[in-house]
């Protein structure tokens, strides 16, 4: 069969283009952990296949990482591996069955790489998780969990749950980002004025109304019932703002410890604020019928230094 030189040249160019299309997605090993780095003109990020945890995110031109990581963190980690953006699924907080781990099993399960794509508006990485013998020990359902990360002018995260079981399932979930800040006493969170809230250490009933901006200058574990899905974190120390916009969740959780906490030092506690899009508490759980899907999505826009 005769193939023209021009067709061969086109095929060669297509092969080169295919390589270039994924050149911004690189798999690496770091401290024995499988990691994937994404980099393009919009910035760079690093994600661990363990838990699909985004561990680092630096938009182009930013001097500091957007995400906090404690100096004591080891990537081999434990089930309470703090920092970055943990994925909390299929329950958030202590809302699983009695005796189960807080924040679900996705955060310490190994995800598979399902796809990677380069587009004009960003680099896209898709990760996935399906049931294993280990997950069935704590949650006896079939499911398909897909996590799509797009590094573009914004960082877009999409967590899609599909119920592949023959039974309905109830789910709470969320993302648990640790936002790195200059000093939490110089931070404010806007977009919560007028929201009903509760202090989760005390109650799960949102029966108080928040007024004005939130200043996380102590220990908080506050859960806000959203009236809008746009919150702004302003760091006066670094002149930086982080804006969260999204859908598919009903709450924002703000968590900060008072002083040292587990593997976090008192100094660590001053340099992060957790502002977490989530659906939590059992009465708020959503039910998926067999074959049904739900998507939690968050777009993160950063400006400043």
Feature annotation, model-predicted:
Residues 21-82, 228-251, 292-305:
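Beta-strand-rich N-terminal accessory domains
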Residues 56, 131-171, 175-176:
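Acidic, contiguous internal or C-terminal segments within carbohydrate-active enzymes
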Residues 1-9:
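Bacterial N-terminal signal peptides that target proteins for export
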Residues 68-70, 88, 242-305:
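Active-site pocket scaffolds in enzymes
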Residues 168-170, 174-251:
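Active-site/ligand-binding surface loops and adjacent short beta/alpha elements
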Residues 78-106, 190-199, 203, 213:
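Beta-strand/loop-rich accessory regions of lumenal/periplasmic or secreted enzymes
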Residues 13-21:
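Hydrophobic h-region of N-terminal signal peptides that target proteins for export
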Residues 27-30, 100-152:
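Extended, loop-rich substrate-binding clefts of extracytoplasmic carbohydrate-active enzymes
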């Amino acid at each position: 069969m005769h193939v023209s030189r021009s067709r061969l040249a086109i095929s060669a160019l297509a092969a080169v283009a295919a390589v270039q299309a994924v050149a911004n997605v690189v798999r690496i090993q770091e401290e024995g952990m499988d990691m994937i780095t994404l980099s393009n003109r919009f910035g760079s990020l690093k994600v661990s296949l363990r838990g699909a945890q985004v561990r680092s995110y630096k938009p182009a031109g930013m001097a500091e990482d957007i995400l906090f990581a404690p100096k004591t963190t080891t990537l081999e980690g434990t089930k309470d591996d703090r920092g970055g953006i943990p994925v909390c699924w299929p329950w958030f907080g202590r809302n699983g069955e009695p005796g189960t781990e807080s924040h679900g099993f996705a955060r310490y399960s190994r995800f598979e790489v399902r796809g990677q794509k380069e587009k004009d508006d960003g680099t896209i990485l898709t990760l996935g998780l399906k049931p294993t013998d280990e997950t069935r020990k704590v949650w006896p359902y079939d499911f398909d969990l897909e996590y799509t990360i797009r590094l573009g002018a914004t960082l877009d995260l999409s967590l899609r749950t599909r119920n592949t079981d023959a039974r309905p399932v109830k789910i709470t979930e969320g993302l648990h980002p640790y936002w790195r800040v200059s000093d939490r006493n110089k931070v404010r969170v806007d977009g919560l004025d007028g929201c009903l809230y509760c202090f989760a250490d005390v109650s799960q009933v949102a029966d108080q109304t928040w007024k004005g901006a939130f200043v996380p200058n102590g220990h908080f574990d506050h859960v806000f019932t959203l009236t809008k899905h746009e919150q702004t974190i302003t760091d006066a120390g670094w002149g930086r703002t982080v804006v969260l916009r999204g859908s598919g969740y009903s709450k924002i959780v703000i968590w900060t410890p008072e002083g040292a906490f587990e593997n976090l030092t008192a100094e660590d506690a001053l340099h992060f604020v957790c502002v977490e899009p989530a659906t939590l508490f059992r009465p708020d759980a959503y039910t998926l019928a067999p074959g049904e899907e739900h998507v939690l999505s968050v777009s993160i826009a950063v400006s400043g230094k």
